[in-house]
Amino acid sequence: MHTVWKGALSLGLLNIGIKLYSAVDENDIKFLSLHKECLTPIKYKKFAPDCTDEEVDDKDIVKAYEYAPHKYIIMDEKELSALQKAHEPRSIRIISFIQNNEIDSVLYDRSYFIGPTPGHEKSYLLLKEALERTNKLGLIHISIRKKQHLAIIRNFEDGLMLQTIHYPNEIRDITNIPNLPSNENYPIQKQELTAAINLIHHLTNPFEQELYTDEYKEALTELIENKIEEQAKTESISPAPNIINIMETLQASIEQAKIKRDNKTEKEAK
């Protein structure tokens, strides 16, 4: 597995060397954009339409923040790099511990497996056992890929998992959704609620993750495989016309050579 982050996790005076690995393998099917005529991948050039149609070199591109319409402040790469280093330490500290059910699932973002570095296996296992016994989550700050995250550390099967969580200001207010109904405007009858609850009970089953697959992705994969197979058949057949054309060309060349030779013989005979 590819290491996403490497450093130390501090629990009081105890330091645990850890590595983070992505827990999710997003095997999305990606398409390329090709030119219809020559099947060459489309390329996009960077240019400034108000200045030039020529492609702008990377050395002439700067980062900027738009603080008002068409008003920008330029961000120096050295300033950004220094700021990033100051807030991206290679050690993280558990801020506090919280109850396992205190965080709403909407706050969870990305998941990472936590593995110990050599020599820190026992400390790693100690933290895992303590979290399991207390049914708690460890709350931390961590910087991953140039962004600082709030995150939790919890037990997961045979190891530990780190899950980044959104900051409160990143979650939109559901009251901004238009036409949200309320009991005052749409009173629910007791028998309606009873029927809905009975239906939920009837359709309730244990969650078996292996029963659920990405049906669209499976169908798309099958379509792609069929197209590859069809193209392979076409490519295996396509050389035949070339061979026939070559044979015809060679035969025609032979006939022309015969004619030229016959004409030459006739001239010499005269």
Curated annotation (Swiss-Prot):
Keywords: DNA damage, DNA recombination, DNA repair, DNA-binding. GO terms for biological process: DNA recombination; double-strand break repair via nonhomologous end joining. InterPro entries: Ku70/Ku80_beta-barrel_dom (IPR006164), Prok_Ku (IPR009187), SPOC-like_C_dom_sf (IPR016194). Gene3D superfamilies: 2.40.290.10. GO terms for molecular function: double-stranded DNA binding. It holds the Pfam family Ku. Belongs to the prokaryotic Ku family. Homodimer. Interacts with LigD. HAMAP family: Prokaryotic_Ku. With LigD forms a non-homologous end joining (NHEJ) DNA repair enzyme, which repairs dsDNA breaks with reduced fidelity. Binds linear dsDNA with 5'- and 3'- overhangs but not closed circular dsDNA nor ssDNA. Recruits and stimulates the ligase activity of LigD. This is Non-homologous end joining protein Ku. It comes from Bacillus thuringiensis subsp. konkukian (strain 97-27). The gene is ku.
